[in-house]
Each structure stands twice: as structure tokens, then as C-alpha cells.
A protein has these predicted regions:
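Terminal, low-complexity, charged helical segments
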Residues: 2, 36-53, 76-78, 82-84, ...
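Membrane-embedded hydrophobic alpha-helical segments
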Residues: 1-25
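Amphipathic, membrane-active segments
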Residues: 19-61
Length: 209
């Protein structure tokens, strides 16, 4: 009987360790992806500023924000906005980012999971808004050429200014999410959860606001 109980206890401990290792791997992979996106955003945030001008460099900004391993496959989508194949690739990647955002809430505890979720969700929403805006710019350009309109007239016809404000709102949302995730407190919580073995203090600190 003792041998059976010992074997059961060992099996339980092995399973627990295996689950802990699996959770650690999921956290590590998601955090590495998130950190790379944070680095890309940090390098290019200076280019994402509201202005009264038509956002003709929108495609360039999109290319900068997708210049990372996890997003490079959709970079060319901004130059092929009406191509069905590229549209599919973009939507699949944005769906993946939404799934990662949701996953963060479950595999990271407390506010750290929410902060990662907010950042990933805001990032994919901005990419989609930039893609939509590029369609608008192309439509506006084609209209101006076909009907011999000025840039200002074409902008008015497609309500570019209103759409531009929506783009800026998405930029502001990502900026706020980045600031939230960049705080020392949140990053400290994430770092503690990246350990395979947590001390009692780590566990308490993780749940403290």
C-alpha cells in the first residue's frame, strides 16, 4: 500500500512539474513576442503623431510597425490593399494577435495579464485601422486622378478628415497601452511570473495592485 501511495505521489508531482513547465513555456513565448513588438513600437512611436495633413506616409508607418519576425509576413499587405490574398493573410495574423491578447489574460495573473492583453489588442487594432486608411488613401488618389480633383477636394469627398481622427484615436490607444505595460511595477510582476519556482513573496506580490 505504501509503495502504491508513493508511486501516486511521485506521479502527481511529475504531472504538476510538467504543467508548470508548459505554463512557463507559454508565458515565455508570449512575452518574447510582446517585448519585440514593444521595441518596434518604441523605435517608431515618434512617427505616429497627429497632424492636420493627409497621412500619405501611412504605408511607411505600417511597414515600420510590422518590421519584426512575428509580423513581417504581412508587411507587403499595405501595398496591396485590394488584393484578396494579402487581405486574408492580414486578417489571419490579426486574428492570431487577438488570440494572443486573450491568452495573456489567462496565463499571466493579475494586472500584468491585462496590460499585455491591452497592448497586443491595441497593436492589432492600429494595424487594421492603418490598413483601412490606406484603402481610403488609394480611393482618394484614384478619384483625384480620374476626376481631375485637387487633393483637398478628394479628401472632402471621401471624408478623409473623419477617418484620420479614428486613426489618431487608435494611435493614442496603443500609446496608452504601451505606457501601462512599460511601468516598472507591471514589468516586475511579469518577471516574477517568468520563474519556474516562485517564493511566497512572489505569489503575494503578483496579486497586489
Amino acid at each position: 500500500a505504501f509503495a502504491a501511495i508513493s508511486a501516486l505521489a511521485i506521479s502527481f508531482l511529475q504531472m504538476r512539474q510538467s504543467n508548470r513547465q508548459a505554463l512557463f513555456s507559454r508565458r515565455l513565448n508570449l512575452w518574447l513576442t510582446t517585448e519585440k513588438l514593444m521595441d518596434v513600437y518604441s523605435e517608431n512611436a515618434k512617427h505616429l503623431k497627429p497632424s492636420d495633413e493627409v497621412q500619405l506616409a501611412n504605408d511607411l508607418s505600417f511597414s515600420w510597425l510590422t518590421n519584426t519576425t512575428s509580423l513581417q509576413e504581412i508587411g507587403p499587405a499595405i501595398s496591396n490593399v485590394l488584393d484578396g490574398e494579402w487581405q486574408l493573410k492580414l486578417h489571419l495574423k490579426l486574428d492570431e494577435m487577438r488570440s494572443q491578447a486573450s491568452e495573456a489574460r489567462y496565463i499571466f495573473k493579475g494586472n500584468s495579464g491585462l496590460a499585455i492583453c491591452h497592448f497586443l489588442d491595441a497593436y492589432q487594432k492600429l494595424l487594421f485601422k492603418m490598413y483601412q486608411h490606406q484603402i481610403l488613401i488609394k480611393t482618394m488618389s484614384d478619384m483625384a486622378q480620374e476626376h481631375h480633383l485637387s487633393l483637398k477636394e478628394a479628401c472632402a469627398d471621401v471624408h478623409e478628415e473623419e477617418c484620420r481622427e479614428e486613426l489618431f484615436a487608435a494611435q493614442d490607444a496603443l500609446s496608452a497601452a504601451y505606457r501601462e505595460l512599460s511601468t516598472r511595477k507591471i514589468r516586475g510582476k511579469i518577471k516574477r511570473q517568468m520563474r519556474l519556482v516562485n517564493t511566497p513573496k512572489d505569489i503575494v506580490d503578483t496579486f497586489l495592485s
